[in-house]
């Protein structure tokens, strides 16, 4: 019974993840999530008190996936500062160009969608995930002996977020390439 319960919960979270990613939080209904999971709406509410609770579970799962992705990327990055930046933005470009219906960072999209709810718990999860990414990048920059690595990391995060947003708007990889060029200039500075 316990295993079945965990499988049902995981199925709901996966169905919600797909729906939130494709449609956004507000456009996703619990009815459609239940149907996608092959369950009833009542069953979904037996596992999650509200759509907001389900969103929190989805974001925790997405945060874990993002951490795994960063670990995978980090293992493949060169140690030199220029190679590191090239690899980082190549990974971003690859993600944007090979993911069907790519729509940028789910965390960023969610925060934009919930902009009128500054205290929403989902925004805290998104903030924590972005802070982890920034710290991860700062660690890589420090290892590559980039001066002021924390500051450079923040600047590169700004470039990355802007590149993702503009790539989503315009398509193509031009904005990611431009962000990579600027990031290389930043890490060349002494």
What are these regions (language model features)?
Residues 84, 98-121:
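Amphipathic alpha-helical segments used for helix-helix packing
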Residues 13, 67, 86, 131-134, ...:
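An amphipathic alpha-helix signature
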Residues 57, 71-102, 153-156:
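Hydrophobic alpha-helical connector segments
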Residues 11, 15-53, 57:
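Helix-turn-helix
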Residues 12, 16-20, 92, 137, ...:
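Short hydrophobic clusters on alpha-helical segments that form packing/core surfaces
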Residues 1-7:
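N-terminal intrinsically disordered/low-complexity leader segments
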Residues 60-66:
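Short, basic, alpha-helical segments at the C-terminal edge of helix-turn-helix-like DNA-binding modules
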Residues 119-131, 142-190:
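Hydrophobic/aromatic-rich alpha-helical bundle segments in the mid-to-C-terminal region
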């Amino acid at each position: 019974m316990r295993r079945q319960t965990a499988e049902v919960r995981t199925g709901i979270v996966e169905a919600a993840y797909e729906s939130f990613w494709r449609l956004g939080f507000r456009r996703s209904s619990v009815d459609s999530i239940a149907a996608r999971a092959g369950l009833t709406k009542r069953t979904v509410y037996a596992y999650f008190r509200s759509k907001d609770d389900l969103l929190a579970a989805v974001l925790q799962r997405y945060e874990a996936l993002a951490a795994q992705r960063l670990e995978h990327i980090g293992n493949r990055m060169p140690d030199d500062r220029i190679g590191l930046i090239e690899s980082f933005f190549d990974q971003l470009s690859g993600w944007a160009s090979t993911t069907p219906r790519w729509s940028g960072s789910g965390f960023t999209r969610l925060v934009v969608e919930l902009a009128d709810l500054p205290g929403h718990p989902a925004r805290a999860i998104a903030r924590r995930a972005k802070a982890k990414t920034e710290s991860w990048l700062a660690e890589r920059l420090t290892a590559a002996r980039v001066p002021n690595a924390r500051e450079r990391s923040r600047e590169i995060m700004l470039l990355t977020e802007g590149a993702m947003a503009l790539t989503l708007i315009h398509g193509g990889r031009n904005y990611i390439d431009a962000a990579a060029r600027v990031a290389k200039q930043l890490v060349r500075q002494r």
